[in-house]
Amino acid sequence: MVTATHPHSLGKLSRIRHLARQYAALTKPRVTQLAVFCAIIGMFLATPGMVPWRVLIGGAAGIWLLAGAAFAINCLVEQKIDALMRRTAWRPSATGEITTPQTLVFSAILGGAGMWLLHVYANDLTMWLTFATFLGYAVVYTILLKPATPQNIVIGGLSGAMPPALGWAAVAGEVPAEAWFLVLIIFTWTPPHFWALALYRRADYAKSGLPMLPVTHGERYTLLHILLYTLIMIAATLLPFVYGMSGYIYLAAALALGAGFLAYAWKMYRNYSDELAQRAFRFSILYLSLLFAALLVDHYFKFVPQV
């Protein structure tokens, strides 16, 4: 026997799904996924064995929720700016579909739940470090730095670079030098990654009034800085090998991926096009994902030739 579903019920279910997608959009899911992925890699690198399941799941979920809370505040603060930019005008905070009070409550729920998960399933060090990262992104970067200086992404990049240290702390209860190497890699990766986006979206940023480097200093200056920061980033990626934290599997991956990144930076510097900048931006995301995956593979299958 087939039971008919009332049209009103279908409409209500559809609205709930739509609203859930809108709230999820406030957390910038793709950015959050990459951050949590790096945090999980940090967890595995902190131990020679397997990460305890409660720490892996509870810790990752807590970091995910606090990251989402920070991004929701970012969307709230920048709702008027987002409405001016084609890339972000669709966001529910920019369209007004989700109101300011609703966004604040949503962020508070995510943040509170994330803090609780980290307290219960990880440790207080991770909880407070993640909360500090939340403040660093939502307040220091979004409110203070981003509208004030073209070096916003450099100075404020530390909060976005913290996930590996958060993951490491969740397992080990400390943040040793090895964890800070991972933070440094993401910290130096962030400017060339973001400036590639800002270059091919510079008309949007000019309209928004935000002092992004391509808008304030021009294309050529930005391209030079992308090239320089790419070289600094490649040097930073060698630290895990130099320190003895990683072996030749990671070194080979770091050099190969770094060569690819440098090729994009050099091509843009020599013969810029928006299409090339867009490809470089996409590659930068793949680059970081593969680099951290190589760290994980090397951690469990380290190859160091005998002398």
Curated annotation (Swiss-Prot):
EC number, as in UniProt: 2.5.1.141
Molecular function, one GO term: protoheme IX farnesyltransferase activity
Domain of life the protein comes from: Bacteria
InterPro entries: Protohaem_IX_farnesylTrfase, UbiA_prenyltransferase, UbiA_prenylTrfase_CS, UbiA_sf
Entry GO CC: plasma membrane
Recorded catalytic activity of this chain's protein: heme b + (2E,6E)-farnesyl diphosphate + H2O = Fe(II)-heme o + diphosphate
Database matches in Pfam families: UbiA
Subcellular location: Cell inner membrane
Principal place of residence: membrane
Transmembrane segments: 31-51, 55-75, 103-123, 125-145, 153-173, 179-199, 223-243, 246-266, 285-305
PROSITE patterns recorded: UBIA (PS00943)
Alphabetical UniProt keywords: Cell inner membrane, Cell membrane, Heme biosynthesis, Membrane, Transferase, Transmembrane, Transmembrane helix
Pathway the protein acts in: Porphyrin-containing compound metabolism; heme O biosynthesis; heme O from protoheme: step 1/1
GO biological process, one term: heme O biosynthetic process
Membrane topology: Multi-pass membrane protein
Role of this protein: Converts heme B (protoheme IX) to heme O by substitution of the vinyl group on carbon 2 of heme B porphyrin ring with a hydroxyethyl farnesyl side group.
Record-stated family: Belongs to the UbiA prenyltransferase family. Protoheme IX farnesyltransferase subfamily.
Note: Carbon 2 of the heme B porphyrin ring is defined according to the Fischer nomenclature.
Name of the protein in question: Protoheme IX farnesyltransferase
Organism (species): Cupriavidus necator (strain ATCC 17699 / DSM 428 / KCTC 22496 / NCIMB 10442 / H16 / Stanier 337)
Gene name of this polypeptide: ctaB
